[in-house]
Amino acid sequence: MVLLKEYRVILPVSVEEYQVGQLYSVAEASKNETGGGEGVEVLVNEPYEKDGEKGQYTHKIYHLQSKVPTFVRMLAPEGALNIHEKAWNAYPYCRTVITNEYMKEDFLIKIETWHKPDLGTLENVHKLEPEAWKHVEVIYIDIADRSQVLSKDYKAEEDPAKYKSIKTGRGPLGPNWKQELVNQKDCPYMCAYKLVTVKFKWWGLQNKVENFIHKQERRLFTNFHRQLFCWLDKWVDLTMDDIRRMEDETKRQLDEMRQKDPVKGMTADD
C-alpha cells in the first residue's frame, strides 16, 4: 500500500518568477540544514534531454541521522540513514524520486509537481486514473497562516503576514490574501500542485513511518514557501545564469559546512 496526497501551494508570484525563486531558495535552505556530517551533498547538477523532455538533472545525498525519528534510528544500521534524491526539473513540470540503498524497493518518496498560473482550482492535474485520484487527499497550504507552522519553526522574518517586498510592493499577506489576488491586476499568482507518493515497507512500522513522512513533507513545503516569498527581494532580479553560478558556489560551501559546522536545521524528534 502506498500513501498518496496532493499538496497545493498558492503563491503571489508568477510561474516564471518561481523558477528562479525556487532554485535560489533550495540553495539557501540547504545551507540551513547542513553541518556536523549531516545535510546535503550535491553529486550531479547538469542539463539532460530524454524522450523529448529537456531540463536540469540533479542527484543529491541527504545525510540524515538526527533528521529521522528515534524509532527508525535505533533499528537502522550505520549508513542506512542516507537518502538519495534524483530530480528531473523540466520546468514547469518537475519529478523528484527519493530512495534509500539499504531499503531498496521497500522505500520510495516520489514528488511530482506541476506549476500552473491559477489559484489551485484544477482537479487531477497529474492525470491519474479516476479510481486512483478518488483516494488522493488534497491539502491546501496557506503560506500566510501561522497556525500551519510549528512554533519551533516560526521566524518573524520569514512570516508572509509581516513581510513587505520593497522591489515588488507585494505583501504583507492578510487573512484573505488569496481572494484579494484575483482583483489585484498588478500581482501575479500561481499554484504548485505537488503529488507525493510515499512507500515504506517495514513490518509493524509502515503506517507510522508513511504518516511521519507526509507530516514532514507538509512541514517542509510550508516552511520552504514561506521562506521563498520572504526572500523575494533577494532573488526577483536574478537570471537563470546567476542561479547556476550560485549553485556551483553552494555545492562548494555545502561540502565545507558538512565537515566543519555543527548539526543544524530541522530534526525529527522536535
Swiss-Prot record:
<keyword id="KW-0813">Transport</keyword>
<keyword id="KW-0445">Lipid transport</keyword>
<dbReference type="GO" id="GO:0120019">
    <property type="term" value="F:phosphatidylcholine transfer activity"/>
</dbReference>
<keyword id="KW-0963">Cytoplasm</keyword>
<dbReference type="InterPro" id="IPR023393">
    <property type="entry name" value="START-like_dom_sf"/>
</dbReference>
<comment type="similarity">
    <text>Belongs to the PtdIns transfer protein family. PI transfer class I subfamily.</text>
</comment>
<dbReference type="GO" id="GO:0008526">
    <property type="term" value="F:phosphatidylinositol transfer activity"/>
</dbReference>
<dbReference type="GO" id="GO:0031210">
    <property type="term" value="F:phosphatidylcholine binding"/>
</dbReference>
<dbReference type="InterPro" id="IPR001666">
    <property type="entry name" value="PI_transfer"/>
</dbReference>
<feature type="binding site">
    <location>
        <position position="85"/>
    </location>
    <ligand>
        <name>a 1,2-diacyl-sn-glycero-3-phospho-(1D-myo-inositol)</name>
    </ligand>
</feature>
<comment type="function">
    <text>Catalyzes the transfer of phosphatidylinositol (PI) and phosphatidylcholine (PC) between membranes. Shows a preference for PI and PC containing shorter saturated or monosaturated acyl chains at the sn-1 and sn-2 positions. Preference order for PC is C16:1 &gt; C16:0 &gt; C18:1 &gt; C18:0 &gt; C20:4 and for PI is C16:1 &gt; C16:0 &gt; C18:1 &gt; C18:0 &gt; C20:4 &gt; C20:3.</text>
</comment>
<keyword id="KW-0446">Lipid-binding</keyword>
<dbReference type="GO" id="GO:0005737">
    <property type="term" value="C:cytoplasm"/>
</dbReference>
<dbReference type="GO" id="GO:0005634">
    <property type="term" value="C:nucleus"/>
</dbReference>
<feature type="binding site">
    <location>
        <position position="89"/>
    </location>
    <ligand>
        <name>a 1,2-diacyl-sn-glycero-3-phospho-(1D-myo-inositol)</name>
    </ligand>
</feature>
<feature type="binding site">
    <location>
        <position position="194"/>
    </location>
    <ligand>
        <name>a 1,2-diacyl-sn-glycero-3-phospho-(1D-myo-inositol)</name>
    </ligand>
</feature>
<dbReference type="Pfam" id="PF02121">
    <property type="entry name" value="IP_trans"/>
</dbReference>
<feature type="modified residue" description="N6-acetyllysine">
    <location>
        <position position="215"/>
    </location>
</feature>
<keyword id="KW-0539">Nucleus</keyword>
<feature type="binding site">
    <location>
        <position position="58"/>
    </location>
    <ligand>
        <name>a 1,2-diacyl-sn-glycero-3-phospho-(1D-myo-inositol)</name>
    </ligand>
</feature>
<dbReference type="GO" id="GO:0035091">
    <property type="term" value="F:phosphatidylinositol binding"/>
</dbReference>
<keyword id="KW-0007">Acetylation</keyword>
<feature type="binding site">
    <location>
        <position position="60"/>
    </location>
    <ligand>
        <name>a 1,2-diacyl-sn-glycero-3-phospho-(1D-myo-inositol)</name>
    </ligand>
</feature>
<feature type="binding site">
    <location>
        <position position="96"/>
    </location>
    <ligand>
        <name>a 1,2-diacyl-sn-glycero-3-phospho-(1D-myo-inositol)</name>
    </ligand>
</feature>
<dbReference type="GO" id="GO:0008525">
    <property type="term" value="F:phosphatidylcholine transporter activity"/>
</dbReference>
<protein>
    <recommendedName>
        <fullName>Phosphatidylinositol transfer protein alpha isoform</fullName>
    </recommendedName>
</protein>
<dbReference type="InterPro" id="IPR055261">
    <property type="entry name" value="PI_transfer_N"/>
</dbReference>
